[in-house]
């Protein structure tokens, strides 16, 4: 028996990685659902694929590292070692890839009936073929850098998630590998002007021209391939270098990420000898390779938007709340009553109006805010810069370690500083994941405040796609908490105490445990409802199981990973778990304890995850 099994009760928990794969399978099921509009199904297939890409980069990458440094470590939900987890992951992905192939075939057949056609190069009509050839000669061929692999031409670095056309070449009795990348600057698809909705994928065009590119060789096998690399970089060293520029250190780390080891090889098309050669060069095993018929990248689904509206969900435009008056300053309306926005049904515009108005308001003296992820063209950043340029004291805590947004946040930090904002970063060892904005106004009667706290990012794009709550309040206790929070962040103090806000790592998990204990004391009159993106934190899982065993009714609404298994007799009989996957991404976190007059409810930016509860 493993140490994890001896220490933890594994009868009502499951491994987080396998639970995550079950979540991504639910996304795949949306792509297979005939009740979902066809183009939305194709987009769900793209989301499934990009989700899986990130899973391999981060989770499989992390486990690969862990298998080297702590091979005997056992995780506490399934009792598996790193190597056992990797074996189970690689095996579990095989049927998912096969199901994706099947769903893609069905979708392409159904979409073709509506004129949306992924046309193989070999099926192009004569006029279309000439059009594609001309495009290839003018737009793609000059950018190509083909290479053969031999003693004079070493195996190149294959960039993460870049598409390559690879070929097994023969010259006399010698075999060589030939490879050429799809240039980053070319579009993923080439529309066919004579057939609206029809297109050729760029990698298919490149693959067709391999015989001309490697014209002095005989091509024995060929395929479109992609390598997924470990992207799990460690920030600890950068954060520990007190005398160094953190932005420069993060930039250096991002460059290192591009060179990390491969963890997966994908191939579109059967080419066993070519596959074996690539695996040997990449130092991967056969179980780390997947052969499919579906395209390896499906993001082109988001470029096909000028089609029959029946192929999409009905258009949804977030509305300006009817209970707010656009002619009255937001500050005055919030002072009269709290404003709770539930994106994407009401829009983010009232909050943006508050920022814009505050930037120009002579009475506003300061704006303090956290930034984790913002939009590519961010109105939030624009208004913060305008406020600083208008003489306001603007402090922005930018989290440089927001995964895959590190580069963007480095750029935003620089832009904010150049506008006159004071920029600080999250403390060493902890990401700042909280979403809070504090605006201070000087009036005749003294200082007044508006505080915004929310479950999601300050991102106009995702606010139209994700469900999130945003509370705008003039509550003075919450404002005092906001003042204390930013003062503590400025001096690096994580131990601060707060009146209404729960702040990890000091009071969040501890309070949740206490609140669950309160419901346990009420027995079968107790009630707990938790809506979150993930449930992985072992101590909280055990406490919820204890609540179930005391008769407390527990409803968990969990979009993604849920390591707690409901309905286990004598352990979790009174717990239900519901996962919602649909048109909008469920992102809000709501924690509710008790019923009626005893009910306590919290909005949160934190999931029931160890990293959220203890390392943020």
Q: Can you describe what each PLM-predicted range is?
A:
Residues 1-528, 546-550, 562-616:
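N-terminal localization/anchoring segments of enzymes in phospholipid and broader phosphate metabolism
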Residues 538:
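Active-site glycine- and acidic-residue-rich loops that bind
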Residues 553-557:
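Hydrophobic alpha/beta core scaffold segments
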